[in-house]
From Swiss-Prot:
Lineage, uppermost ranks: Bacteria, Pseudomonadati, Pseudomonadota, Gammaproteobacteria, Enterobacterales
Listed name of the protein: Shikimate kinase 2
Cofactor note as given: Binds 1 Mg(2+) ion per subunit.
One GO molecular-function entry: shikimate kinase activity
EC identifiers of the protein: 2.7.1.71
Cofactor list: Mg(2+)
GO terms of biological process kind: amino acid biosynthetic process; aromatic amino acid family biosynthetic process; chorismate biosynthetic process
Highest taxon listed in the record's lineage: Bacteria
Annotated organism of origin: Salmonella newport (strain SL254)
Length: 181
């Protein structure tokens, strides 16, 4: 059994897309903390924040993180999961944390192209490019502090997955169908 692999980074860096591809490449299970949370409370992130505030959402996010953390699982986390010190320590201690790093321009382009963008609550109330820049400035150091590996997420999903697999210890690089020794 291998440690969970946690993907962290801002909105639009590709945590879910890369996570699913990485899980397929490694034979691991895939989990997404935001999706798990939404399916268990039957509300969108925006609805949770509206009803419970960011503090309530962050508490639920921690519960989701603990619930989906399991050996041999790739976990796509919410962009703000690193704001809670407990979450940073937990992920760093329990698993391998990978920061999917991308510049503001890439993040904005991806977010503008997402059909579910309206389901995400604004973090600052500012235009998207300003919000992404501000949020990344506030969180980048926390992503870096938490990560075991920092990966350039501007490439294609296949390239990013290959870079992640190359960075991981050999025991984690087994492809589906390989024999674990």
């Amino acid at each position: 059994m291998m440690q969970p692999l946690y993907l962290v980074g801002p909105r639009g860096c590709g945590k879910t897309t890369i996570g699913m591809a990485l899980a397929q490449a490694t034979g691991f299970r895939f989990a997404d903390t935001d999706r798990w949370l939404q399916s268990h409370v039957q509300m969108s992130v925006a609805d949770i924040v509206e009803k419970e505030g960011w503090g309530g959402f962050r508490a639920r996010e921690t519960a989701a993180l603990e619930a989906v953390s399991a050996p041999s699982t790739v976990v796509a986390t919410g962009g703000g999961i690193i704001l809670t010190e407990y979450n940073r320590r937990y992920m760093h201690r329990v698993g391998v944390v990978i920061y999917l790093c991308a510049p503001v321009s890439t993040l904005v382009n991806r977010l503008e192209a997402e059909p579910e963008a309206d389901l995400r609550p604004t973090l600052t109330g500012k235009p998207l490019s300003e919000e992404v820049r501000e949020v990344l400035e506030q969180r980048d150091a926390l992503y870096r502090e938490t990560a075991h590996y920092i990966i350039d997420a501007t490439k294609t999903p296949a390239q990013v997955v290959s870079e992640i697999i190359a960075a991981l210890p050999p025991s984690t690089q087994r492809l589906q169908g390989d024999v674990y020794t």
